[in-house]
Design a protein with these regions (language model features):
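OB-fold and OB-like single-stranded nucleic-acid-recognition modules
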Residues: 1-8, 12-185
Length: 185
């Protein structure tokens, strides 16, 4: 079961629904630690126990931050969990304010007056590192350079964007401040 990522990665990343059957408590704990949701944030994932009871994986995934706080402070080591949760359930964050450390992406494919604050994340293996971030509307975007480290405080709305292929979180910058590089980037 320690090799679940490489064995199941392709199946999980392309599925709309993933069901793990006959889960013991130990298997459930292992699946939460492996963060299966990271492999496909938009998939519905259920854990069925040996008695046939079904558990919604996302609903029971513990989050290390308070989504009801006035400002949701995302610690650097928790960015990936927040990204996955916000991608899978954007309405949970609609109207909320978040603060996090990120790198700026200001490529030509980003609309004027916007940038993408994000982090590089690994879903399955080292060859699978990708930039994970949400569009952030920020009128002073021209002051940023690619890979600048910034501390972002932003309000969130849920909008339909082609990049999201459906509704997703859009950040509206309140503050964007220069920051020190994360210990683990």
């Amino acid at each position: 079961s320690n090799n679940i990522g490489p064995m199941m990665f392709e199946h999980i990343t392309t599925a709309d629904l993933v069901v793990f059957n006959r889960c013991t408590d130990e298997l459930k704990d292992m699946l939460y630690k492996k963060n299966i949701k990271a492999m496909n944030p938009r998939a519905a994932i259920y854990l069925d126990d040996v008695n046939g009871n079904s558990e919604d994986y996302a609903r029971n995934m513990p989050l290390p931050f308070d989504v009801d706080a006035d400002i949701i402070d995302i610690q650097p080591e928790d960015y990936g969990l927040w990204y996955i949760d916000a991608t899978g359930d954007p309405m949970k964050y609609d109207g909320k304010t978040v603060r996090f450390l990120a790198q700026a992406y200001v490529g030509k494919d980003v609309p004027a007056g916007s940038f993408v604050p994000g982090r590089f994340g690994m879903v399955c293996c080292a060859d699978d590192v990708t930039f994970l971030g949400f569009l952030c509307r920020y009128p002073d975007r021209d002051q940023l350079h690619n890979r600048d480290w910034v501390k972002v405080t932003a309000s969130i709305t849920v909008e339909e964007l082609p990049q999201y292929r459906g509704p997703g979180p859009v950040l509206h910058a309140i503050t964007v401040e220069p920051a020190e590089k994360a210990k683990e980037d």
